[in-house]
């Protein structure tokens, strides 16, 4: 019986299809020549030089920073604070929590910059969530901005790990360089 098995393996036709493991294309993150600045009307942030701004509608501060190398978009939504700061924060937290259904967990990092009056939270949503990173920031008086990452690919956390690592750095850069127009001496 063992001899028959060895003979069968040696003379088996090679044209038999073998399933191949699922593969994912390699993502090449381009070098950042020098930071570019999104100068949306109510705020400005530094971002990777490969990203381009696409305004949405006519409301200032609404649009997407598009990252073509990974089919990623960071959707920015700016809203003026008009006595509704707690409602804006609640909405931002609710939108982040909605992704918890498909997530393996969520962590939050608080960001405070008193000199620029920037106070915010970065949400890291683990697993195969549609939006793995989100943030909001405010000056607690006049300005509120929210950002959410969307990558237009199947949300597989293993294959997207390098992209999520890149965007975690981008979101940190947004929070560290965010300035409100008219509040910090910028024109």
Regions found by a protein language model. Give the residues of each.
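N-terminal targeting sequences that direct proteins away from the cytosol to non-cytosolic compartments
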Residues: 1-72, 84-93, 101-110, 114-117, ...
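A short gly/proline-enriched turn/hairpin at secondary-structure junctions
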Residues: 77-78
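Hydrophobic/aromatic beta-strand elements that line small-molecule binding cavities or substrate pockets
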Residues: 109-110, 132-139
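Short beta-strand segments that buttress and anchor functional surface loops
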Residues: 120-127
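Beta-strand secondary-structure signal
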Residues: 122, 146-148
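Short hydrophobic/glycine-rich mini-motifs in sensory/regulatory modules
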Residues: 140-146
């Amino acid at each position: 019986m063992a001899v028959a098995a060895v003979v069968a393996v040696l003379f088996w036709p090679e044209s038999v299809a073998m399933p191949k493991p699922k593969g994912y294309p390699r993502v090449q993150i381009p070098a950042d020549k020098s930071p570019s600045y999104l100068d949306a009307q109510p705020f400005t942030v530094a971002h990777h030089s490969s990203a381009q701004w696409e305004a949405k509608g006519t409301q200032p501060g609404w649009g997407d920073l598009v990252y073509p190398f990974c089919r990623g978009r960071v959707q920015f939504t700016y809203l003026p604070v008009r006595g509704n700061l707690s409602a804006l924060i609640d909405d931002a937290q609710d939108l982040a929590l909605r992704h918890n259904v498909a997530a393996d967990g969520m962590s939050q990092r608080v960001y405070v910059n008193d000199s620029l009056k920037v106070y915010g939270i970065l949400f890291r949503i683990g697993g195969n969530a549609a939006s793995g990173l989100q943030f909001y920031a405010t000056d607690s008086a006049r300005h509120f901005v929210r950002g959410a990452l969307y990558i237009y690919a199947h949300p597989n956390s293993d294959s997207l790990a390098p992209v999520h690592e890149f965007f975690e750095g981008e979101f940190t850069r947004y929070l560290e360089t965010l300035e409100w127009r008219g509040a910090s001496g910028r024109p």
